[in-house]
A protein has these predicted regions:
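Accessory helical-bundle/CTD segments and flexible terminal tails appended to RecA-like ATPase motors
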Residues: 1-93
Length: 93
């Protein structure tokens, strides 16, 4: 699962990406890679960061989805992270 984070402020986005990756690592352990800049790191006025989450093929995706949504809600609950845009790509390439 690719998790894309978008924001207009690059320094704030880097902080958001590090914070989200840390929270995901507490849940998923070493299956979290990143954050990293994708090949196209900016589209119009939005900067982009990518976090990769490796999930086994036999693992229940429903539980993973619930955990991802929970982390996203925790992130957007903070005032400084309200402008965070999150996009999930469950079938990259």
């Amino acid at each position: 699962v690719y998790v894309y984070l978008k924001n207009r402020n690059e320094t704030l986005l880097d902080l958001m990406a590090q914070t989200m990756a840390t929270k995901l690592r507490t849940i998923f352990g070493n299956r979290v890679l990143g954050p990293d800049k994708p090949p196209v790191a900016r589209v119009q006025t939005l900067f982009i960061r990518k976090i990769i989450l490796k999930i086994e093929t036999n693992a229940p995706m429903v539980r993973a989805r619930e955990l991802l949504v929970q982390v996203q809600k925790e992130m957007t609950a903070e005032d400084r992270f309200k402008s965070l845009i999150v996009y999930y790509d469950v079938d990259p390439m």
